[in-house]
Every structure is written in structure tokens, then in C-alpha cells.
């Protein structure tokens, strides 16, 4: 009996067609399955914008890299014609060296999904988000090769930092959030992120 192998994900051309279709709701590919994305609520979008504004002062001022808002990155197969996964974080940072290398190696990159795993991902938790779903996304990001994930919790006014090598660390109030080696020079008391 011949065994059928089912390839998870979708062809790159199909992925691009669906992403460009105005009638297709936004989606991610998680574990090979198409998962519809929930719309961003205003408070989460505002917190992401505020954090991006603070971070970009250091990122742009020191030419450290690029901070993207709600841009999808894909996990391509080795032949780049198949998408095995896609993620759309609230914010993501890619170092200038990695991004410039990617752009130079990929002519026409602007017309294709971003096939580059970010260095840092930031997710802003909405009141409707389930903790188990957020933690699953964190695990997927780290498995994808993201070096660090920040989870911003508006309800608790805290940020939890996840890496592959260290236990999660939660910061709040006067504790200082830093960009570490990824974004040297960035530091702010966590409370500043939640000021109106």
C-alpha cells in the first residue's frame, strides 16, 4: 500500500494570492494550518505604537535595524516555493546587518512575503487573549529562531521577557526594560510604557 505524505502549509503563490485578496480575512499559518487572526483592539494598537515610538528613538538614532508593525514573516521551505508557517507579531525588530543582507540577497524582496525571522518579537496582549494562546505563540516564535520575545500585558502593566536560554522575567513599575545586546542603548522604566 502506498503511503500519502501531506505537506503542511501552502504554495508560496497561493499564499501571496490569499494575502493580496481584499476579501480574505488576515491569517497566519500555525503548525501548517491556516488560522484566522483576531482584529487588534485600539488599546493594544496604541500600546504597540507608543512602545515603537520609544524604541525607534534609539534604533533609528544609532542605525541598529528596523522595527516593523504588524508585518508578516514567513517560514519558507528550503526551495522557497512553499510556506510552512507565517506569523504577524504586533512589532518585530530585525538588525540592520541581517536585514540588509536579506535585501541584497533577494532581488524583488518587496513583492514577496518577508522570509526572515526577526531578532525580537513584541506581542501586546488584548483583554480577549487567552494566556494559553499567548504562551503557544511565544513558544512558536522561539522555535522559529526569534532570539527574544516581549509580551506586553496591558491589564497588569507588565512586560514578560522570554528567551530560549533563560527563564521568563516579568518587569513592571520602576523596573527597567532594556534592549540588551539586540538594541543596545534602549532602556525605559516599564511604567512609562503605560502612561497616557
Task: Indicate residue ranges for each PLM-predicted region.
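Gly/Pro/Ser/Thr-rich low-complexity, intrinsically disordered segments predominantly at protein N-termini
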Residues: 1-196
